[in-house]
UniProtKB/Swiss-Prot annotation:
Signal peptide: none annotated. This is Multidrug resistance protein MdtL. Keywords: Cell inner membrane, Cell membrane, Membrane, Transmembrane, Transmembrane helix, Transport. It is found in: Cell inner membrane. PROSITE patterns: MFS. The chain crosses the membrane at residues 4-24, 38-58, 69-89, 95-115, 131-151, 158-178, 209-229, 246-266, 270-290, 294-314, 331-351, 357-377. It comes from Klebsiella pneumoniae subsp. pneumoniae (strain ATCC 700721 / MGH 78578). Its main location: membrane.
Length: 392
């Protein structure tokens, strides 16, 4: 079991590392490539576009050919893309490299969740996904610090060489440590009944798809508007902003790491309801805040709410799928990336302020999700398993 957890964690961590590692070198990259920082900021969107593109096919391939081949190819592509980014001389080639990096990260991300679905039952999967969420929260804090330390002695290209090394390590783990987890097909006579149970149009799956998409939209909106909110509206300098973001990351980590223990006392539905109540409370707090301390409390509620509920919701979303776990993971990833990007784009077009953009999605997410959690309950078997897990 340890090998699957290690490989899954490594596969997932390529995604946030690819986003956060290079940001500290962005001014130098822009200078060397003859582009403005504003032009290179599109590299974030290009990276997400690459991830979404990969998710369109990676899950289906993983279900048909296996998890291990997709993991190996994804890690190998990440290595190649990182080398491309390190060697480019124009901004257009840099963006191409970032797109390919996104394809690689998206493939690995999908496979990681499929592996966890294959190897863990509902109860353990919810706990592991909560831990994974906590580990992922460490990357936005550590990656820029590591990048800064690297650039004290080496040029910005070394950031992508570091990512190359990460890709090589993931590839080695995928080749030598990871074992194939794809379930074998059931007897032909059982296929129609099995397929009906694993439909992507299943009411329960669609409800968890919407809940997780809205939750990711909340957290990505928070990340996107935090520089404007804290440095322009609240008057923080870069140092204070970094400290505030580190504090929020610590809240996320603390809640994520404690969630597995809380799951031993409460059922998953209670944690998801708590998550949405925290989102609603955060929206109300931010809309009424007149002091910086109160605003920071509201932002802390966002981090806590996401951390306590997202892993559980993802586990429930993947629960009904055995043979189609890869496809289900792909659909979840695409919806989350595209849904959050769509909201941020629409809010910018409408002209919402940073604060109103955040408050709007908090209120919408909490109300819609609370209704779905109260109306759409898990299948009877899953409910029984949840209750048995809590009692034990």
């Amino acid at each position: 079991m340890t090998r699957f957890l290690l490989c899954s964690f490594a596969l997932v961590l390529l995604y946030p590392s690819g986003i956060d590692m290079y940001l500290v070198g962005l001014p130098r990259i822009a200078q060397d490539l003859g582009a403005s920082e504003a032009q290179l900021h599109i590299a974030f969107s290009v990276y997400l576009a690459g991830m979404a593109s990969a998710m369109l096919f990676a899950g289906r391939i993983a279900d048909r050919s296996g998890r291990k081949p997709v993991a190996i190819v994804g890690a190998a592509i990440f290595v190649i893309a990182s080398l491309i980014c390190a060697q480019v001389h124009t901004s257009s080639h840099f963006l191409i490299g970032r797109f390919i990096q996104g394809i690689a990260a998206g493939s690995c991300y999908v496979v990681a969740f499929a592996i966890l679905r294959d190897t863990l039952d509902d109860r353990r999967r919810a706990k592991v996904l909560s831990l994974l969420n906590g580990i992922t929260c460490i990357i936005p804090v550590l990656a820029p610090v590591l990048g800064h330390l690297i650039m004290l002695k080496y040029p910005w290209q070394s950031l992508f060489y570091t990512m190359t090394g990460m890709g090589v390590m993931v590839a080695v783990l995928s080749v030598f440590i990871l074992r194939e987890t794809r379930p074998t097909a059931p007897p032909q006579a059982a296929l129609p009944q099995h397929d009906a149970g694993e439909s992507l149009l299943n009411r329960f799956f669609l409800s968890r798809l919407l809940i997780t998409t809205l939750s990711v939209t909340v957290i990505l909106t928070y990340v996107n508007v935090s520089p404007v909110l804290m440095m322009e509206e609240m008057g923080f300098d870069r140092g204070t902003y970094s400290m505030a973001m580190a504090l929020m990351a610590m809240i996320s980590m603390a809640v994520s790491f404690s969630t597995p223990f809380v799951l031993s006392l409460f059922n998953p539905r209670t944690l998801m309801l708590t998550s949405q109540v925290l989102f609603l409370a955060a929206g109300v707090t931010l809309s009424l805040a007149t002091r910086q301390a109160v605003t920071l409390i509201g932002l802390g509620m966002i981090c806590a709410g996401f951390s306590v509920g997202f892993g559980v919701a993802m586990s429930q979303a993947l629960g009904p799928f055995t043979l189609r776990a890869g496809v289900a993971s792909s659909v979840l990833g695409i919806a989350q990336v595209c849904g959050s990007s769509l909201w941020i784009w629409l809010a910018a077009i409408i002209g919402l302020s940073a604060m109103n953009m955040l408050i709007g999605i908090l209120i919408a997410c909490s109300i819609v999700s609370l209704v779905l959690l109260l109306v759409v309950t898990p299948p009877r078997v899953a409910q029984y398993d949840e209750e048995a897990a809590v009692e034990s």
